[in-house]
Amino acid sequence: MEFVIKQSVLKEELGFVQGIVEKKSTIPVLSNILIESIGEGTIRIVGTDLDVTIRCEAEADIKQPGAMCIQARKLFDIVRLLDAGDVHFAKEENEWVKMTCGKSKFRLAGVSKENFPEVPSFKNAPLKLSAEIFNHFIQNTAFAITNEQSRFTLSGAKFIIADATARMVTTDGHRLAFIEKKLGENSATTDMDALIPKKALLELVKISRDSNGEVSFGEDPNHIYFEVDGRLLITRKLSGTFPNYEMVIPKDNDKTAVFDADEMKTAIRRVSLMADERTRSVRLTIRPNEIEIGAQSSEEGEASEKVAADYQGDEVTIGFNSQYLQDFLNVVGAAAAEAPETEKETDGETVRVKENAGRPRISFEFKDGSAQTQMRVAGDSAYNYKYIVMPLRI
């Protein structure tokens, strides 16, 4: 095999597969990527860890068709340091690959294509959803996925499409993130209900973050396929039964306090410095017109801070893991900063403004100090987004 490709093009596509390729694996070939020619002017780059696979395509001048397998990390480290221009690849005997760019020359050890895992064949993708919606779903839910590998069914997101509505739910057993959005009549033609691994979700964000188009996706009994801008991500489904999340969403929280998300986030960050290192617990005392955040450590001291809130009712104190609150407030703030712009007429002039412009305010809905609390963005009509947290004993 022999081909020539632009350094900038190769660097971009190699960057997408780095998060998939195993750097240290009991199966050595998984540290490699497969590069093969397709037709006269395209190469295909494939990386896999057997659970998640990414396949990219890039324009190249194919001198001789074929395939090569090269160590992924080493190749990426070399390519990103090369000068801009053409990079020439030529496969030699015994799977060695000669690589030149300007005055730079490299000779890389490769492995046979026959040793590379077979990539699942891509099925037709009957469903489409805008990349913006997919990224918003993942950004607002992925943080609540458990990091405990033993809790297999909680190590991904439940993704549902039914009744012209898309929904994503995640939980680690202590908190739950739920988001849904009504779709247009022509957005989905088939229902779906699947568990998607966290790693696949995060890689999907990477390959679709800068896309203004749609993500096409479909499934077979074992895999889910996502395609965006010519890049394909294939992931194994998680097996098992996801918890009945509808039972967790509170139905009788009769008290609501509304506060500024940024003010609360900053206050919790400061006060939590004095929280117990093991539980990270802070207490929120909700009173008319304010919420007081407090934390204490028997060994280090204590701290408190007040945040203004729209609330009229009896005083209630609730304990929380401070990190759970910060995770939610962080993604709400990030979503507001990245909100899309729309054109509006003002005094006869067309101006571009952010949707939901301004500092986000949080609706904090609770019943008492022992029942789960629900938080959502006040006034958000684009998405039905809920975050439910179990309280701590204080």
Each PLM stretch: what is its role?
Residues 1-394:
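Structural preference for solvent-exposed beta-strand-turn elements
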